[in-house]
Structures are given as C-alpha cells and as structure tokens.
Design a protein with these regions (language model features):
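Soluble non-transmembrane domains of integral membrane proteins
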Residues: 5-8, 12-198
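Single conserved hydrophobic/aromatic residue that forms the stacking wall/gate
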Residues: 1-7, 11, 435-443
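Helix-loop-helix
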Residues: 58-59, 70-84, 88, 159-434, ...
Length: 443
C-alpha cells in the first residue's frame, strides 16, 4: 500500500507536457503527457462538453520490458467546510451512490470518523445547496471510496483490482468529472445519457421525493406557460384544491353542520356538566343522528401538510427557483418577504432586526387564517378557544422567515379554502335549520 501511494504521488506531482492544442474548449480537447524513469508514458486526454462535464481518458504506454500494475484513482479536495445553516431538510457535505444506495455524510461527521465503502458501481462527490463536484469511475470496475478529513475534506476512490500492463502494452481508463450547478434538467440529462446510477439524487429531494419532484416539474411547466414562478405557484395551489375538492367538501360540510349544532352542543354540556359519561353518550347520539364526524374538520389541515413541505422543499433546494421574482417588492421567491410591519412596510426610515421582519405577505397570510377561523365552529372550551384565536398570529410570526413563495402558497390556499367553506356553510345552514333536534332525556 505504501509503495502504491508513493507511485501515485510520483505521478501526481510531476510536471506534464501539453501536446498540441493548449486551449480546452468543447470543440478542442487537450492532451497532457509525462514519461517516467522506467520509460512508461502516461497520457491524459481531457475534454469538456458545453455545460459541466469533464472526461479524463488516462492512457498508459509501457515501453519497458517489465510488467506493472496500476490502480486508477480520483480525488476531490475541499479545504474548508462552508459556512452553512444547519437545516434539517438539506444535506451539504460528502455524498455518493454506491451499488444504488445513497450515502450522505456531513462535514462534522467526517471530521470525527472516516467513511469507507467498496462498490461495483456508483459515483461520489462533495455537494452544496446549489452546486456539486462529482467523480464517476469507469463502468464495470470495482472500487473503494473513502470520505475522510486530514486538514482537508477528501472524497476519493481507487480501483480495487489492479490494471496489469505488460511490456510494450497500452491500456486506457476513463474518469468522468461533473462540476455542476444543480439544475434539474441538466442533472437528469447526465444521469440518463451517461448511465449514472441515481445521479438525480445529487439534488436533495428529501423524504417526500415521490411528491417533491413531480411537484417541481408541474411548477416548472406552469412557469414555462406564464413566465413567472409566483403565478406558477398560484396555479399549482388551485390544482391541489381541485384534486382534493371532494374530500375537502365532505370535511367542510361536516364542519358546517357542527357550527349549526353548536347551540345544542352547548346546551347538552350545561345539562350534563356533572355527568361526563352521560354527556359523551348524548354527544355521540347527536353526531350519529345528524351524520356528523367531529374530527373531519382536521382533514384539510392534514391534506395541506405534505404539500406545504413539498413546496418548501422545491423552493429551498432547486436552483431554478433562485432569484425568481414575483410582482411588486418580491424579488426572490426563495427568500423571505423583505418588508416589515414594524417600519410600516418601508414608510419609516428604519431597518428592523431580522426577527421583526414580518412582511406584507405574512400579514396577509395571518389575516386569511384569522378569517378562515371565523368560519369554523367555536370550541366550547374557553381555553381551547383562546389558543385557537392566538394561532394565526403565532403562525404569522413563525412563517415570516420562510420563503415568500411558500407564504404566497399558504395565503392563496387559505383564500380558496375560505371561498369553498363559505359557500358550503351558507347552503348547509339553510338545510339544518329545518332539522328538529330532540330534547335529551333528563336524569
């Protein structure tokens, strides 16, 4: 192993000669060569495409009378870990797919412990939020990968089987290097055209991969139609509402009935306040009689959660969303609303600290949540009612730092929900007002 490393250092640290063309372009590759003391010639033919791909074809010409073994290898070095915010939904660090298994190692993990794996196929690299540098070893060659830290972060591979080159024999090996911005179409194109196993996972789609990726393609489709990602987000919100319209319709009808039944429920609670068991029985009888599901009102919230996180993920990790403007003051949908209610949205010449940046769109979102809440039945428990009343303000503060595109999605979704809910309540109220609610049996 030591002798092998010495040979590697000998090859790597030599001065190479450029043969012929000395300018690397997509139409003109370059050739580097070097001959060692044993009369073995090493040639590197380096070519690039018109985007991010480098191909390094390494040829060894053995002009000696002996047989030698060589171990092709490649290495990516990062001197320092970047300054990153520790988001739980995004991986930045060392990455690879080995025999179809994704491996993600954070910088701090590698500082503490080396990672090694043997594989028959795959790729390895170092990734940031929007950028990746990756190595793709030659196909059908087994290799070992090491992620380690020795004053520098290193992602490297070395073939585990020697390439034997006899006297007067020539052999070649090709390594692909991709130094890319993580644009979805480009990454997918390399994965398909170069047959790179699961290279699309270079973009951190996350746990909701099955939902996030199709959602991105749909948003991107609407963007190509409208020319604005903000409008695309609004259209995707409408599509989601349409898909789940029947389920939301059922839920809102049940909530509307609950609101109409609220006086009767209050009366029952007052009547049976000393007998919890009897109260429960009477309540269940009332629900059964009027065909009301008391928990169905939670369905719209549960429906929103996966799509909320999926859109957040799309906004957060896809390069296509970066620096995409909406209308007015929103210049980047992947960033928070830059305005603040505490300086009257820019009318007062004062820059509030970041935790006070509660902008126009978060305020609109909070207002839409408050108005939607007014359409729901009031909780009979006073403490619960106060908590619910405080909830829109709480979420406004919590979601204010989130990407403005996500806040726009939430606001439009609330408005559409209110419209649907309002119509259903109006229709259901008239219908239920004709229902006679029988008196409960008194004890």
């Amino acid at each position: 192993t030591t002798a092998r490393r010495q040979r590697q250092m000998c090859i790597r640290d030599r001065i190479w000669t450029i043969e012929g063309n000395n300018k690397l372009t997509p139409n003109s590759p370059i050739k580097l060569s070097w001959t060692n003391d044993q009369n073995i010639k090493f040639i590197k033919d380096i070519s690039i495409d018109d985007q991010y791909l480098f191909k390094v074809n390494q040829t060894i010409i053995n002009n000696s009378e002996k047989t030698y073994n060589f171990y092709p290898y490649g290495q990516i070095i990062r001197n320092l870990a970047p300054e990153i915010i520790d988001f739980f939904i995004l991986h930045e660090g060392l990455i690879g797919v080995f025999d179809d298994q994704l491996v993600e190692e954070d910088y701090d993990d590698i500082e503490e412990k080396k990672f090694s794996i043997n594989a028959d196929k795959g790729w390895l690299g170092i990734t940031d939020k929007y950028w990746i540098t990756s190595l793709i070893p030659q196909e059908n060659r087994k290799f070992r990968t090491d992620f380690d830290y020795k004053n520098k972060f290193r992602a490297n591979f070395i073939e585990t089987s020697a390439t034997e080159i006899g006297a007067n024999e020539t052999k070649s090996n090709e390594i692909k290097i991709i130094i890319a911005a993580k644009e979805v179409d480009i990454i997918a194109g390399y994965a398909e055209n170069l047959n790179i196993s699961k290279y699309d996972l270079a973009i951190d789609w996350g746990w909701f991969y099955f939902l996030v990726k199709p959602l991105f393609f749909l948003i991107d489709y609407f963007f190509k139609l409208t020319g604005n990602f903000g409008i695309a987000i609004i259209l995707i919100t409408i599509c989601i509402r349409i898909v789940f319209f029947p389920l939301a319709n059922y839920s809102f009808k049940s909530m509307a009935k609950m609101k109409v039944l609220q006086p009767e429920m209050t009366r029952l609670k007052e009547l049976h306040k000393e007998d919890k068991m009897k109260l429960q029985q009477e309540m269940m009888a009332l629900y059964k009689k009027e065909k009301v599901n008391p928990v169905s009102g939670c369905l719209p919230i549960f429906i929103q959660i996966p799509f909320f996180f999926a859109i957040y993920k799309v906004l957060f990790v896809t390069l296509e969303m970066r620096h995409q403007p909406f209308y007015g003051w929103i210049k980047d949908l992947s960033e928070r609303d830059p305005t603040s209610i505490f300086n009257l949205f820019g009318l007062i010449p004062w820059d509030p600290p970041s935790f006070l940046l509660i902008g126009v769109w978060p305020c609109l979102m909070g207002l839409s949540m408050y108005l939607q809440q007014k359409l729901n039945p009031t909780p009979p428990d006073p403490i619960q009612a106060k908590i619910f009343a405080f909830f829109p303000l709480f979420l406004t503060v919590i979601l204010a730092p989130f990407p403005s595109g996500l806040v726009i999605y939430w606001t439009i979704n609330d408005i559409l929900t209110m419209a649907q809910q309002y119509v259903i309540i109006k229709r259901t109220t008239v219908k239920l007002s004709l229902i006679h609610i029988s008196e409960p049996t008194r004890l």
